[in-house]
Amino acid sequence: MAYRKRGARREANINNNDRMQEKDDEKQDQNNRIQLSDKVLSKKEEVVTDSQEEIKIADEVKKSTKEESKQLLEVLKTKEEHQKEIQYEILQKTIPTFEPKESILKKLEDIKPEQAKKQTKLFRIFEPRQLPIYRANGEKELRNRWYWKLKKDTLPDGDYDVREYFLNLYDQVLTEMPDYLLLKDMAVENKNSRDAGKVVDSETASICDAIFQDEETEGAVRRFIAEMRQRVQADRNVVNYPSILHPIDYAFNEYFLQHQLVEPLNNDIIFNYIPERIRNDVNYILNMDRNLPSTARYIRPNLLQDRLNLHDNFESLWDTITTSNYILARSVVPDLKELVSTEAQIQKMSQDLQLEALTIQSETQFLTGINSQAANDCFKTLIAAMLSQRTMSLDFVTTNYMSLISGMWLLTVVPNDMFIRESLVACQLAIVNTIIYPAFGMQRMHYRNGDPQTPFQIAEQQIQNFQVANWLHFVNNNQFRQVVIDGVLNQVLNDNIRNGHVINQLMEALMQLSRQQFPTMPVDYKRSIQRGILLLSNRLGQLVDLTRLLAYNYETLMACVTMNMQHVQTLTTEKLQLTSVTSLCMLIGNATVIPRPQTLFHYYNVNVNFHSNYNERINDAVAIITAANRLNLYQKKMKAIVEDFLKRLHIFDVARVPDDQMYRLRDRLRLLPVEVRRLDIFNLILMNMDQIERASDKIAQGVIIAYRDMQLERDEMYGYVNIARNLDGFQQINLEELMRTGDYAQITNMLLNNQPVALVGALPFVTDSSVISLIAKLDATVFAQIVKLRKVDTLKPILYKINSDSNDFYLVANYDWVPTSTTKVYKQVPQQFDFRNSMHMLTSNLTFTVYSDLLAFVSADTVEPINAVAFDNMRIMNEL
């Protein structure tokens, strides 16, 4: 045996040799205990086996039945010093373990509504920049000129399509698009103001500062800057702020101001924000002890139901999202309190079993795995799995009849769909062949794998006993009822389970089974089954209460679920040991546990935040897909767009999602309509593409190709360069048209006739690489002939900056030499900065306060748990 007698009274005739042997045994046991505690604390798993010496001693003990029964009773006493050893050594393999995966829980809880981020600056694509002016002879003048340039000119070098730049720009706008703007929060002091006036944001202030200090600024402009300040209209709760913005940026910010998502907030809205079932639950006392100011605002969460139907044909994604929901749900299911003492319960069970030597092997297993940790774990697993609709699998030992009888309670209260079919069939088959069929003397059921009927469905047709057949009928038809509550699809338990009446039905069936003769089985077998049933039936009242408690906690937490509870079996399962179900049935006390209001609010907030973020990311992805389609980038960017969408949901491991699900997700996203604000923003970008291209230093509007040398020309912004500002006199061919048709005969003929040709269309403008090679990479079939006929190395566009302080190029002393190029880049002039045209007044509310956590205003408490009532206005736990 693994446990030895210590300090037990010996018979009076024990000799000295026995006493010496006893001392040696005590020392050996002490060493074993020290080693055992080390093993328990270590994470290394090892199989616990008896040593040869202990086996020999056990053989000797078996010689006397009296000694054997004493040995057994000593184990069952489970004194305090033995308790941990028993739980961790004998029962270690039967206790279910759960790793909380805190990283996933943290990811879920860290998803905050992005709307609440505070805007400190206006949205801008452009910024004014000073550029030098070059004289006709190429020298740089001392004076400067202001132009609007792109703030983030992020066009990468190399093979890059300008249309991709606009797609990335749109993505950037969607990321930065504020859901509300409060100008008062971002306003800063105007340093050059006479009366400490304020301008709309820090960038406007820095632009004003730079212009004020520029020597060429007119006096009238300086005087205007000194007068720039906010204008308050207190009666209308409105304030106007001066701003310096490019007209396109002004259009963006004006649109954001006109389409803010904030709505007035009052007590009624907060009250209605609380799930209705929690508001109406008499166990929770909710109070709002403050009135909100009239300037209170909130952003309504976007709680549209799942438009992608992730449960339908997205096995990997569905598994991930249900796992995350399961981990979150486990963290909020309350812990059981005041469970029956494990020691006392095992003692009582051993008395009920009237354990004797003959029944040691079968009936001592009944006590295996019974401990409070397993009971609590089972309670949490059942509720969390139902809340997240995670499929469960059952682990059990067929010879442990107590586990199977507990499994009958489990199958009674939990719908069949919650278990993976193979596991459900195995458990039902074990119950049928171990308990039900032997009771009536029926032959073993030989179940064929793949049979559409479950063992219980087959048994229901063959069992003549009304009570047993009635119970089997209930289990076979135990399904969730789908009920839409507050627009959310809920999976609701059967009313007979919610009020606990089904347990009486189960007990009637068990009593009928225990009264049967088991004609084909030995007497010991019949007695073992009867005693197992007796153990469970002795706790009828507690089982009714447990069932009501389980249903109440499930439905209360379910009120905080905001996404439709779709029931689809998951790829992976949550393991449930039937020994832990036995622990729950045997150790449940009479203490009611219900979720604390703070826990409910936390669970509700996390669900709302994830759901709202999910919908916003869908809207972003749909908008980007539509934009890619309209920019003719549909095929090129599609998978990257879907991957980006999944990454922004935080919980998915994108690299492991199969490609077929990625493309299915793309197809679903493609069918959804674009949200209005996002569509308007894209149209704003489309209308102003030309202005944005002009402001970039890396985008040109075309390229001129010639066979003969073309002289460099003076440009006011760059000096002597091969940049053309107009296309007068050149034959023009549309670059997009050329790429689409693939007809390049026209361009080839022109070049062979030494006629310069201008290919017009946006293209990357990189000064140190070949324009032709860049174009050729866009479509090799179109430009292959051109590249083959010409020396590509001679076609590099050259950017000559000729002035005294330039390191780029120095003129040689040969005045007959004229720098030339065989290509010119066609680049339109960016918009010149005009202070008067850039001055805009922006209007917003003078002040309002946005509240993100609405439930912070609600103070909540519960009634004394002992008084908590279920849906039928009866106490949840009646057995006191």
UniProtKB/Swiss-Prot annotation:
It is found in: Virion. Residues 1-80 are annotated as: 5-fold hub. It holds the Pfam family Rota_VP2. Residues 1-38 are annotated as: Disordered. InterPro entries: Rotavirus_VP2 (IPR007779). Residues 394-414, 422-442 are annotated as: Hydrophobic. GO terms for cellular component: T=2 icosahedral viral capsid; viral inner capsid; viral nucleocapsid. Residues 19-30 have a biased composition (Basic and acidic residues). Sumoylated with SUMO1 and SUMO2. Sumoylation of viral proteins seems to have a positive role on viral replication. The keyword Aminoacyl-tRNA synthetase does not apply. The N-terminus binds RNA. It is necessary for encapsidation of VP1 and VP3. The N-termini of 10 VP2 molecules form a cylindrical hub underneath each 5-fold axis of the inner capsid. Belongs to the rotavirus VP2 family. Inner capsid protein that self-assembles to form an icosahedral capsid with a T=2 symmetry, which consists of 120 copies of VP2, with channels at each of its five-fold vertices. This capsid constitutes the innermost concentric layer of the viral mature particle. It encapsidates the polymerase VP1, the capping enzyme VP3 and the genomic dsRNA, thereby defining the core. Homodecamer; each decamer is made up of two conformers of VP2, called VP2A and VP2B. Interacts with a VP1-VP3 complex. Interacts with the intermediate capsid protein VP6. Interacts with NSP5. Interacts (via N-terminus) with NSP2. This is Inner capsid protein VP2. It comes from Rotavirus A (strain RVA/Cow/United States/NCDV-Lincoln/1969/G6P6[1]) (RV-A).
